[in-house]
Amino acid sequence: MNIKKAFSNSLLSLLYKKPLSKITIGDLLEDTELSRQTFYNHFLDKNDLIAYVYDTVIVNRFNEGFIFLYAV
């Protein structure tokens, strides 16, 4: 299991339910069924997770959009 991916997917899923400012580490742990120690073994804090999601998910989707535009 890719732990970082599990937490990033959880964050993206929780964003459909509540604003980012209201999402807690506890929410992520409940959603992923992983431990707090596991979270902190992979991320410094929630902001570190947000940066990871930005770098790995959002930037990739943004770049895929440009690839699509250039292909047309």
Question: Language-model segments: what does each one mean?
Answer:
Residues 7, 11, 43, 50, ...:
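DNA major-groove recognition helix of helix-turn-helix
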Residues 13, 23, 55-72:
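Amphipathic alpha-helical linker/stalk segments
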Residues 17-47:
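Helix-turn-helix
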Residues 32, 54-55:
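Contiguous, function-dense segments enriched for cysteine-driven chemistry
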Residues 2-24:
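Short, amphipathic alpha-helix enriched in basic
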Residues 39, 50, 57-61:
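A short hydrophobic/aromatic micro-motif that marks alpha-helical segments and, especially, helix-coil
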Residues 4, 46, 59-61:
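Short, structured secondary-structure boundary patches
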